[in-house]
């Protein structure tokens, strides 16, 4: 695979690359690059997470040595799953199982547990050094990476450790690339700034889009005055709002019901969850999407790329109901092997039930 091909694969469907020039230089160096994503095991896996899962797959195929960090301690600090570490660890196992059955070759991943990292004194020395090189105001602004606002630091002081831990994860693993949703931008920018002060390697940040919730992306009064990445974090698909999300364990019928009830105004592409599912989840997996229609309405039509489909939708050539049916059909094809894998393992079925009762924001 050429450098241009690797670059195209790594950057496709990314919301932001900081910076593209640095990424190209790293690829041109011909050194084996190391990347990572850390995930909080915080509940059921919804399809929004498939966006970064696909990007992990892309990076592995592009020859990047990827680390998957099971951020169990981070989830505990963030009060996920009631702060029950045993349940958090179960959720981590479940997440890795989903990633594997999505099609990521987990044998090529370096899977690291935060539990192991926090046992190392060198790790905590890094956390302190990062904190010493960061202002309190900067740390508080970065709390949105946890899905929290700056004022929520008053809940308990451990919340203030979280951003320094995330930056320390990056330095401890000696990474070239950090992958995350756009909601992780503040942590990655903090890491880049602190790297210069501490003489550490400056990461390239790859930010994937956040899938909007099924209710759509109508701007709420709560988002007034917020930065764009924080606004997207507010309207994203969330496991704490089950009817706004599609979970990988949902039945075929539930997927169809949720898709058919989703926000999808005729001719409108902005913050349209159905179009986003097609763009970020379905088209990266399939060469085409077929819209089945009655012959009276023009008959079946196939689209070989997302841009062509979006244009047709904006121009009113595709009806929302036809779009939804095609989306549900393709999405269920992607989810079927994941569902079957979870069904074959009773421990995961039991885990899903426990997690469903314990999900927190």
UniProtKB/Swiss-Prot annotation:
Q: Where mainly located?
A: cytoplasm
Broad EC category: ligase
Q: Which UniProt keywords apply?
A: Aminoacyl-tRNA synthetase, ATP-binding, Cytoplasm, Ligase, Nucleotide-binding, Protein biosynthesis
Where does it reside? Cytoplasm
Enumerate the GO terms in the molecular function aspect: ATP binding; tyrosine-tRNA ligase activity
**GO BP term, pick one:** tyrosyl-tRNA aminoacylation
Q: Where does L-tyrosine bind?
A: 36, 162, 166, 169, 184
SUPFAM superfamilies under this entry? Nucleotidylyl transferase
Positions of ATP binding: 239
User: Which ranges form a coiled coil?
Assistant: none
Q: Which GO terms describe its cellular component?
A: cytoplasm
Q: What are its E.C. numbers?
A: 6.1.1.1
User: Briefly, what is this protein's role?
Assistant: Catalyzes the attachment of tyrosine to tRNA(Tyr) in a two-step reaction: tyrosine is first activated by ATP to form Tyr-AMP and then transferred to the acceptor end of tRNA(Tyr).
Subunit comment? Homodimer.
Protein name, per record: Tyrosine--tRNA ligase
Look up and give the organism this protein is from. Saccharolobus islandicus (strain M.14.25 / Kamchatka #1) (Sulfolobus islandicus)
User: What's the gene?
Assistant: tyrS
């Amino acid at each position: 695979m050429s450098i241009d091909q690797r670059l195209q694969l790594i950057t496709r469907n990314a919301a932001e690359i900081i910076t593209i020039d640095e990424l190209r230089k790293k690829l041109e160096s011909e050194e084996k690059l190391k990347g990572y994503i850390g995930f909080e095991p915080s509940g059921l896996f919804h399809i929004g997470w498939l966006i970064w899962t696909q990007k992990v797959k892309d990076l592995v195929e592009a020859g990047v040595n990827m680390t998957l960090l099971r951020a169990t301690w981070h989830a505990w600090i963030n009060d996920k799953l009631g702060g029950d570490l045993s349940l958090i660890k179960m959720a981590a196992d479940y997440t890795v199982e989903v990633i594997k059955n999505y099609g990521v070759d987990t044998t090529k991943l370096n899977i690291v547990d935060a539990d192991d990292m926090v046992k190392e004194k060198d790790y905590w020395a890094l956390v302190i050094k990062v904190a010493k090189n960061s202002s309190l105001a900067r740390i508080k602004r970065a709390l949105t990476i946890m899905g929290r606002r700056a004022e929520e630091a008053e809940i308990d002081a451990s919340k203030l450790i979280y951003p320094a831990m995330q930056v320390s994860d990056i330095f401890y693993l000696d990474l070239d690339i950090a992958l995350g949703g756009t909601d992780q931008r503040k942590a990655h920018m903090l890491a880049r700034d602190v790297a210069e002060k501490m003489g550490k390697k400056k990461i390239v940040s790859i930010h994937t889009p956040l899938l909007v919730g099924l209710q759509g992306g109508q701007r709420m009064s709560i988002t007034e005055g917020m930065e764009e990445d924080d606004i997207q974090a507010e309207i994203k698909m969330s496991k704490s709002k089950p009817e706004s999300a599609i979970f990988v364990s949902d039945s075929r019928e539930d997927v169809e019901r949720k898709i058919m009830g989703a926000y999808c105004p005729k001719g409108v592409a902005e913050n349209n969850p159905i179009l986003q599912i097609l763009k970020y989840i379905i088209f990266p997996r399939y060469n085409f999407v077929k819209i089945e229609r009655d012959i009276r309405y023009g008959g079946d039509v196939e689209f070989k790329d997302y841009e062509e489909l979006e244009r047709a939708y904006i121009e009113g050539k595709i009806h929302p109901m036809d779009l939804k049916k095609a989306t549900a059909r393709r999405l269920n094809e992607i989810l079927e092997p994941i569902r079957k894998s979870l069904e074959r393992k009773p421990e995961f079925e039991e885990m899903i039930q426990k997690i469903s009762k314990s999900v927190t924001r």
